[in-house]
Amino acid sequence: MPVQGSQRRLLGSLNSTPTATPHLGLAANQTGARCLEVSIPDGLFLSLGLVSLVENVLVVTAIAKNRNLHSPMYCFICCLALSDLLVSGSNMLETAVILLLEAGALAARAAVVQQLDNVIDVITCSSMLSSLCFLGAIAVDRYISIFYALRYHSIVTLPRARRAVAAIWVASVLFSMLFIAYYDHAAVLLCLVVFFLAMLVLMAVLYVHMLARACQHAQGIARLHKRQRPAHQSFGLKGAATLTILLGIFFLCWGPFFLHLTLIVLCPQHPTCSCIFKNFNLFLTLIICNAIIDPLIYAFRSQELRRTLKEVLLCSW
């Protein structure tokens, strides 16, 4: 969040997008070529962040309020919501400070602003890493609940879940501090990209295996009740569609940001890569959108959580 220059958002040292009036159009890159640039209006960015913030606060509140939701699965879901909350909140704070500085409504020394920028960047980066980790943890938890159903409660205990949560948070903070300190080292950026790909592969393998097991189970039930094959095919199509949506949203929302990091290492001066760098704010907006979608996929599908959430909202009124 530098006071001057072109850097506007999270991890300002990675962002080469110049401040511009919100638009969708052609912009000149460093070589004079024309390329597509999508600028996100500050109002839209803040609005999406606010929606995500409120949504995830409700999830955390509902899980904390209902003791029936104090299980390992909901522990991971709560931590995912907390991570998404921090992603949205830190980006909103950074954007608000930038706007206040640009408007002259906030006066601060460059050293103070730089320290604030470092703190916000660490919070944002650590919450991003923890969000990815908790998405993977939820996938592992669901996998164990399906393939080791009889031993699930002895394998995934609340103390073990809490230790896993603590390890994820500590590792996320430590690695984010290293990333902020050594952002200009290619190895650091590549480690982040490899981490993202590892989470993507982990989730894909686990969910595909779970889908295959569910299809086998449905086929067995169909044979037991002598149902016709189309019913089993319909179940398989619905499962495949759900899996495609889940992994597709994950890749669409997170992929562009990590593509950005990859291109910084591979082609920092190439005209085509420079065009992609100009859309850094768009990539951050997609991550905010993921923070909005996560509760819809992982939290609000629970009837117990929805009931608790309704009670929380009614009590607040």
Curated annotation (Swiss-Prot):
A lipid is attached at residue 315 (S-palmitoyl cysteine). It is found in: Cell membrane. GO terms for molecular function: melanocyte-stimulating hormone receptor activity. The chain crosses the membrane at residues 38-63, 73-93, 119-140, 164-183, 192-211, 241-266, 280-300. Its main location: membrane. Keywords: Cell membrane, G-protein coupled receptor, Glycoprotein, Lipoprotein, Membrane, Palmitate, Receptor, Transducer, Transmembrane, Transmembrane helix. One of its GO terms (cellular component) is plasma membrane. InterPro entries: GPCR_Rhodpsn (IPR000276), GPCR_Rhodpsn_7TM (IPR017452), Melcrt_ACTH_rcpt (IPR001671), MSH_rcpt (IPR000761). Residues 64-72, 141-163, 212-240, 301-317 are cytoplasmic. Residues 1-37, 94-118, 184-191, 267-279 are extracellular. GO terms for biological process: adenylate cyclase-activating G protein-coupled receptor signaling pathway. Receptor for MSH (alpha, beta and gamma) and ACTH. The activity of this receptor is mediated by G proteins which activate adenylate cyclase. Mediates melanogenesis, the production of eumelanin (black/brown) and phaeomelanin (red/yellow), via regulation of cAMP signaling in melanocytes. This is Melanocyte-stimulating hormone receptor. It comes from Erythrocebus patas (Red guenon).
